[in-house]
Amino acid sequence: VIPMFEKETGIQVVYEEYETNEIMYPKVQSGAIAYDVVCPSDYMIQRMIENDLLAKINFDNIPNIKYIGDTYLEQSRQFDPDNLYSVPYCWGTVGILYNKTMVDEPIDSWSVLWDEKYKDNILMQDSVRDAFAVALKYIGASLNSTDLNELEEAKQLLIDQKPLVQAYVIDQVRDKMIGNEAAIGVIYSGEAIYTQAENPNLEYVIPKEGSNLWIDSWVIPKNAQHKENAEKFINFLCRPDIAKMNFDYITYSTPNTGARKLIEDPAIRNSKIAFPEPEDLVN
């Protein structure tokens, strides 16, 4: 969609990817490169707001915000209390993807990640945030816990788990699960949709103990050199047809109500992985 934006506006886009929020943060913090638009995750946006790294968005320049569902704007208040600094782009859950031909029974709990019979068949996310989220939820704590005893217990669980883990991965979990190289993997819901299309033996579940519902959003760094152009870009991405094209490409759930209506395949439009029921998100 970037060439479309460039053609429509005459604005040239320099596009750069990063693998984790933790890689992105020091780049923005240092100010070495004056990024105009960045797409961090919820917890990192909160950190950036607290450290005065973000500019308030002029929503007069983003009329397409009307297509972003109220549910997601309300969810965003957990990290952007007054909805001043961010515009939701995509969202999802973290759960377990398992191969039905390689496990003994349906999975419904994080406890399977500590089951010794699956030694060397478990894939974990190479992310401090997601690894701790799994362990904290497993012990019944909040994934945002700051309790030192809970954090220490979660840390010890992850240390104890390490001998059972085949690999700590990010994008590779998708290919390994499709290729039957592991029985169980911690995965983002958007990746799960793609993997199931490639391998029908794969099943995705949000464990009963609860999970992480995350939102990635567009923000504008305080030192942005082209703030109005950044707002034009965000508004463009909020257009339903553009948001739908992005959903088709990345398969992560869209908060754009107009885009969801444009999804042709009812199996995807009504997918419980892409768009879980509210009761499935209680925890």
Which stretches of residues belong to each language-model region?
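Early extracytoplasmic/lumenal segment of secretory-pathway proteins
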Residues: 1-47, 175
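Hinge/lid segment of periplasmic solute-binding proteins
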Residues: 42, 46-91, 104-111
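Ligand-binding "clamshell"
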Residues: 49-56, 80-84, 194-206, 268-270
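Short beta-strand->loop
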Residues: 55-66, 86, 200-212, 221-224
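A bilobed periplasmic-binding-protein/Venus flytrap-type ligand-binding module shared by bacterial periplasmic
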Residues: 95-102, 137-138, 214-226, 245-246
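Short loop->beta-strand "edge-of-pocket" segments that line small-molecule binding or catalytic clefts
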Residues: 112-128
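Ligand-binding pocket segment of bilobal, Venus flytrap-like solute-binding proteins
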Residues: 123-127, 131, 135, 143-207
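Mature extracytoplasmic/periplasmic domains
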Residues: 221-281
